[in-house]
């Protein structure tokens, strides 16, 4: 479901949105609640995944960021890759939500601020048999 873009969180202290106002540390995994209302975003509990624009800002070292469901093991793939002191870099990320409506973000090295804007969400579609295709 497309929505008006809304800021889920911003870890920069000068413009903090959400519960955190400090950069992610090297090797840190950060858990973020997605469903509910944070004053900027209102994502329904029925959402199963979200479409986000994730931006890294002020990276201190070459690293990568992985975004994944909070109830899943960390995958080996990354969503953003950068070099130290690189300019702010965005990437679109579609991520499934955990059963509790959460995601995790893993920062491999150095410190980095992260900004996440939600642009849409996915929900299970209830339909009748007119749209059912039998194998």
Per-region residue spans from a language model:
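Short edge beta-strands and adjacent beta->alpha junctions
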Residues: 1-135
